[in-house]
Amino acid sequence: MTSSTPLYDENEDYIDENHINTFAKALLWEDDDHDGLASPPLPAYEGDKLAEVNAEELSSVLTPEPNNESEKSRPEFVVSHNDWYPINAPEKSKAKADAKGRKKRASTRDEFRSSAAYTLLRWPFLIIITVWILLLCILYTVVRAYVALSEYMLTWVGERKVLRNKLRASKTYEEWIENALELDRYLHLDKWSSIPRFSYYDYRTVKRTTSKLRMLRMRGMDEELMVFLQGCLKKNFAGIENRQLYAHRYYGTKNVVHVYIDEVVASIDHVTESENITPEDKRRFFRSVSRNYGRTALCLSGGACFAYTHFGIVKALLDNDLLPSIITGTSGGGLVAALACTRTDDELKQLLVPRLARKITACEDPWYVWIPRWWRTGARFDSTAWARKSNYFTLGSLTFQEAYHRTGRRLNISTVPADPHSPVILCNNITAPNCIIWSCLLASSAVPGILNPVVLMMKDSKKNTIVPFSLGSKWKDGSLRTDIPIDALKTYYNVNFTVVSQVNPHISLFFFAPKGSVGRPVASSRRKTRREKYASLRGGFIATALEHLFKLEIKKWLEMIKTLDLLPRLSESDWSSIWLQRFTGSITIWPRNNFRDFWYILSDPSEEGLGEMIRKGERYMFPKILFLKHRLSIENAIERGRTKSKLSTAHLEHSPRFSGTPEFAGPEFQLQTVHYDDDYDSESSAEETLSPGFSQGTHAVLTDESDDDSSDDEIDD
């Protein structure tokens, strides 16, 4: 059912046609391995007018004016040829190519594929391994079916089933908590929280640390408190971030952990407000513990139209003030991440509604349009059409740096070069600050056969024009090699805690939590929980062992295929990593899809369908919120203290001529931008400098350029 209420900014046109045309022209360029000249022109698949653009017009748009005649004969714009050239396009005759003075591009061949033994045995090996993997998949399916049927028919019956259905029908987080506590009480799981002993964390250390922190805080021993906090503000201190602490109840963890979290937050806030600690000591302290504790990131996987479930994940986090400031997305997840990082909180609350489906029109072309296009170009969708449609989600031609300045959130989108052996790039405000988000979004969605590789575009803010990024190289779907870029996030932003929303259908089918997952304990009988026996394995020990055995065996043979390079390079892409990546994080959400959903995997959702996807994402996020809330409560307390200590240090050290705040210093005082050296490399603030300036305003702006090893942090006061 379609609503008549208009969507927020529904009628706004964020499209810059000049940028779209420049992007479309860039797609027509090709290079040559030998002389650098342009290769034969491509067939008209991006529009008849664009296909007819001559090389001189393109060169004037995409490259600077040459200085001499030798430069005029060789354009500086370089892109790949083998991935972009249509797989079904007719080849021009050699005579015509020679007439234009162009050489045919030489095909590249992997040197390790040249041996006689490889040529002779490759296909027999691949066929045998594939048949064996299929047999293992059948056995794996039998084990999973046994576990599911045993739980459905023997465990989830009677009142327990009624309470679970009630829990699944919860529409708000508050309602979900109420229903989860009711189910915990019925299953006697609430008693588990009051028993401190548990083998997955050091409860004695947690209790002693809590008592010590409380004693130091109450006695006003601020220096000692600060030193003691440095020892416990680290990732997974004493095991308190072990997932098993949140996997034995539908809502809740050990009471000891609750008390510890509250005391740590209170102690950090006490240090922040303490007048017994110098601002410089505070700054050093918060700089150290921030680096030690790390940051949290939200990672949204690809998954075609299943990725729209991420809207519900973002909405649940936003409604509970838990949306991390670092968000990464790949393919369809990149679309959701782009929307979240280019809009403010208030704007997002108006956009994350079923009416957003009106702007999701990527798959609107009927079959009689996209089938001929696929036959001509090798891709179902048109790149320039997607560029126009994605502008609403990226707020026009916004760059990564501009999005960060607008919302304070750091957007990351993973893309893969068209060359199968080139390294992956994680585009963000550090690696590609001037790169236009929608071009990166298209590249991350360029699955072979769905969308051809595209050129990333970057903005020249002074001229308000765009030019090709990275010498015009072409890029495609990042999920082929790095769906969840955890290592890159740690490098750029010191991320060591990740919330992963995984909707890839080929991955979620193999998810199995034998010991339960966060907010979803193993379904044990009430007889066992009544006797305070809370630990059990799904389906029993034998079923769990067989499930793990078959899954590891499948992974082993997939690894063998990758190592021996047995798979053919379809569309010049390496497909061997799509099952062999790391797809999980500290918290992993696996929204379940029905078989009928696969029919609509490349279809635009209706308002009713998108509303159901949003509700599904919320339901699957609710069980994880408590775990994330505990983590972010400490992280946010550290950031509050760090922000305040920076402001205090800058004010006291660089304003010695007067006391008080800038508004009392006269109408012509203005505190200008402060540039800090790297917070973690400098041992003191001796390198920190203040650039004073005088104008008629009294507004003070403080900017820190070094939030982490290579990140930016802006604070406005």
From Swiss-Prot:
| Superkingdom as given in the UniProt entry | Eukaryota
This protein's GO cellular component annotations are: membrane
Is-annotated flag, keyword Ribosomal protein? no
- TM region positions: 123-143
> Which species is this record about?
Meyerozyma guilliermondii (strain ATCC 6260 / CBS 566 / DSM 6381 / JCM 1539 / NBRC 10279 / NRRL Y-324)
Its placement in the membrane is given as: Single-pass membrane protein
Q: What class of enzyme is it?
A: hydrolase
Which residues are annotated as active site?
A: 331 (nucleophile), 477 (proton acceptor)
InterPro entries in the record, alphabetically?
Acyl_Trfase/lysoPLipase, NTE, PNPLA_dom, Triacylglycerol_lipase_N
GO molecular function annotations of the record: triacylglycerol lipase activity
Q: What is this protein called?
A: Patatin-like phospholipase domain-containing protein PGUG_03164
| Family affiliation | Belongs to the PLPL family.
Tagged with keyword 4Fe-4S? no
Q: Which SUPFAM superfamilies match?
A: FabD/lysophospholipase-like (SSF52151)
Localization recorded for this chain is: Membrane
Q: What does this protein do?
A: Probable lipid hydrolase.
Q: Where is the composition biased (Acidic residues)?
A: 704-717
- Alphabetical UniProt keywords: Hydrolase, Lipid degradation, Lipid metabolism, Membrane, Transmembrane, Transmembrane helix
Q: Which GO terms describe its biological process?
A: lipid catabolic process; triglyceride metabolic process
Residue intervals of the PNPLA domain: 298-490
Region: Disordered; residue ranges are 680-717
Query: EC number(s) in its UniProt entry?
Result: 3.1.1.-
The short sequence motif called GXSXG sits at 329-333
